[in-house]
């Protein structure tokens, strides 16, 4: 049948199983919005307060489900407002489709109103992007974009469609979405055999898990693998939940704000098995001294990650779920009780601790964990609160923690929470923010109230830019340049002005009551939780130092002379 391009686009979204789109209309994309209006029973459109919020919401939807998230915006500033969200998704390998509409073909290259080369702008931050100037190519382009976004290492894809394409007609025939194939052709039998021999020879193995294990859906295979080789487990920020955080073999996050146990264990192990982790500089500290006693065995779907930052001794390239399945078939049951006892003894001697009896970041996270029975979806912004959320909430399953790990995007979390809640209405969704981050995109509270999306925003409010100030305190002679927020914005009143319920709390009891009420209300809520400006995130590794030199608050006086 013959349809307009805008109708073809919407039909292709339906083909791919898209049920929710986040966006903001404008001149060049009007035809698409007209088509969406006609199909509002099949595809829900969430009008965000800003296009950046739409891109983060699509990201949160994707991370919470493993499906492709979709956002859209008009040409010019609408398109450029998506850029930060696209870059966030790119750095964390999140499958989103960003749909933009540009000026008509006849107006391209003429500095037309709201014309921008958004494909050129986003080329370095997309897995692929397309410019569609022919309506006859639109349907296949959309189908290909979804396949690219999902296949192999996931990532964002941009489709820029000229306005005349959305108005022109072409033949459309519905097609079933192409099944995404797991990348297995690079998994070599000899590489599997090498991995088996290295694991069997190890006396002190350590498993290090990243976001690739979640993207692959490898949590069950990972659990079997870990217990079969009887190894302690550390993870990255992006790998939280791939391995159950309540399992006795789990020792916590690795790296700059990782646990002392994980940083110690990886520094002492003789084999580091890396499952879908990309070796961010925040993980390894001093590259020359990282896991100095160990051979490194890396599993990853992307060959570009092998030897990129840390030299490996052996690797297996391919889908990590399939790799682990093959290894589980070949490996015997192993016993490393003596090694595990050593690591656990160190963990018991260096536990995660914080000041009790006063409202602090760690207390806030532990209370949310308790109130949600460890079953909520937690999104975060970026900073101290992000690290506390990683350290003190025990993630039992994949896709529970949504956070900007690679780009470190302040303003990410609220949009992501909205996207996650739209995707997982059965889950409680909390966004953990700092007061600096909340200012970035707090207008999205209006989105939550417009659609009654019951996300709970917890602002860990220390009236400073906490993480930057922590560095200034420890490494910049306590010169607090532009990190003190003296304006004292009343976030509870801001919330109420945007239609949400607002709380201001400063004690543990007040916070406990606010969280309990927020869960019971089942409406958008903002809790302004006021803590001391000098609270810091520990443990910590100084910039450029090896992770074995991880220090806690108890070490500050000796290390810094105060």
Regions found by a protein language model. Give the residues of each.
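Thiamine diphosphate
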Residues: 114, 450-543
